[in-house]
Amino acid sequence: MKTVEAMRDFFLAGDASELEKAYLEICGPSQGEASFDPDWQEVEFAFNRLFVGPAALEAPPFSSVYLDGQSLVMGKTTLDVRGMYGALGLESPWKNTLPDDHISLELDAVLAINHLARQTEQVEIQELRKRFMTHMQSWVPLFAGKILQAPSSHPAINHVAKCLSQWLQEQGEQ
């Protein structure tokens, strides 16, 4: 779960130092292509082009962009995700600031669902987990693909996208 927390934090990072900290949590001391030493200011610049703006985002981190058909944020998917959070008794701490279908908020919901699933064997929680993972599997591969194809991407961000894809694939196998 530490990796999921670190991926959540990576996609919510506000600056180069937060990106570096989350990245090192994801990668551990040294891991394949992750063992290089990136210029974190360059990573921050690429991160902003991909996920923040102010220009058009190269890889929007919102499920509604990929699932609602018009590349719009705050669509039907956002409200569906908000409903799933509500079923868990959760509310986004960024409500009215950051759309509920942001990748980091969805990863945070996975952490909450997994925590609840470990504490109870309620069928409803297991079904909600399955529904939420199906939702993530419907859009995260598209999101990761956008990252990997984006002209502004950076090897560090590409590595995180690959880790996210690998984690999601492993979840589907459980």
For each predicted feature, which ranges?
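Surface/interface-facing alpha-helical segments and adjacent flexible terminal/loop regions used
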Residues: 1-174
